[in-house]
């Protein structure tokens, strides 16, 4: 996979892309990152990338020319048709399902905005996706773009140590993930549930399923609205409601 980041602050990416899973993914040739300062594509001698909004108002707006030129040139160099992603508060709410969708692509290109926002022509005629990571506003799109890239890259084949690692993550099954424990079995009187040390894999599997459902019911009941509950799971929820 190829992932490009168009940004005015390329230095923000160095630590994240060069660490942990993202660095390992590059070492395994699973992904190739490219960070591009689109200021270099500005067509004026001062390399201006923003201007005052028509109609007045606070803040500055990113001009279309540098962004269009950068995207068109980088796309031509790479060949193909990348998913061109705007990260912005007005976009589609990001989910694990969207991460899985993007992980099937060959080329992603993130446009990281700053200032008051993008010229609307970028949104209407250049981007293929608009993504929001939540109902709040950040200074720029760099942090959300890195977060999305991380969630996508870890899904690529061979990146994680075990292929099933991401299959049990929160949201991958439609539920929050079950609790985890490690040694010691008794720490300051706080004990690991007996079932996890029993060696009975069928009971362990059932415990994890039940705890995953319980955690979702208590913390994110909205996720259960479209979740296909079994009859047994419905009984569990009924018991929890009556406590």
UniProtKB/Swiss-Prot annotation:
Question: Which domain of life does this protein belong to?
Answer: Bacteria
- Where is the major localization of this protein? cytoplasm
GO CC annotation: cytosol
InterPro entries membership: Alpha/beta_knot_MTases, tRNA_m1G_MeTrfase_C_sf, tRNA_m1G_MeTrfase_TrmD, tRNA_m1G_MTases_N, tRNA_MeTrfase_TRMD/TRM10
- EC number(s) from the headed UniProt entry: 2.1.1.228
Q: Which GO terms describe its molecular function?
A: tRNA (guanine(37)-N1)-methyltransferase activity
The broad enzyme category this protein falls into is transferase
Pfam families in alphabetical order: tRNA_m1G_MT
Assembly: Homodimer.
Q: What is this protein called?
A: tRNA (guanine-N(1)-)-methyltransferase
Instruction: Say which species the protein is native to.
Output: Bacillus licheniformis (strain ATCC 14580 / DSM 13 / JCM 2505 / CCUG 7422 / NBRC 12200 / NCIMB 9375 / NCTC 10341 / NRRL NRS-1264 / Gibson 46)
Gene coding for it: trmD
């Amino acid at each position: 996979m190829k992932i490009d980041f168009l940004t005015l602050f390329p230095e923000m990416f160095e630590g994240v892309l060069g660490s942990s899973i993202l660095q390992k993914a590059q070492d395994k040739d699973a992904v190739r990152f490219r960070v591009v300062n689109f200021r270099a594509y500005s067509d004026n001698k001062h390399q201006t990338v923003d201007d005052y909004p028509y109609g007045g108002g606070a803040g500055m707006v990113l001009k279309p020319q540098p962004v269009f030129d950068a995207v068109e040139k980088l796309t031509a160099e790479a060949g193909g048709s990348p998913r061109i992603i705007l990260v912005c508060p007005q976009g589609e709410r990001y989910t694990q399902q969207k991460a899985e969708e993007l992980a099937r692509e060959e080329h992603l290109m993130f446009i990281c905005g700053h200032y008051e926002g993008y010229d609307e022509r970028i949104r209407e005629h250049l981007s293929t996706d608009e993504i929001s990571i939540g109902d709040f506003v950040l200074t720029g799109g760099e942090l959300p773009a890195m977060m999305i890239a991380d969630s996508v890259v870890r899904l690529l084949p061979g990146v994680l140590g075990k292929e099933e690692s991401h299959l049990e993550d929160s949201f991958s099954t439609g539920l929050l993930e079950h609790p985890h424990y490690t040694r010691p079995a008794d720490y300051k009187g706080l004990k690991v549930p007996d079932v996890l040390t029993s060696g009975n894999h069928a009971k362990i599997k059932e415990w994890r399923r039940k705890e995953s459902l319980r955690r979702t019911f208590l913390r994110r009941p909205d996720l259960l609205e479209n979740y296909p509950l079994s009859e047994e799971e419905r009984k569990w929820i009924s018991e929890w409601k009556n406590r």
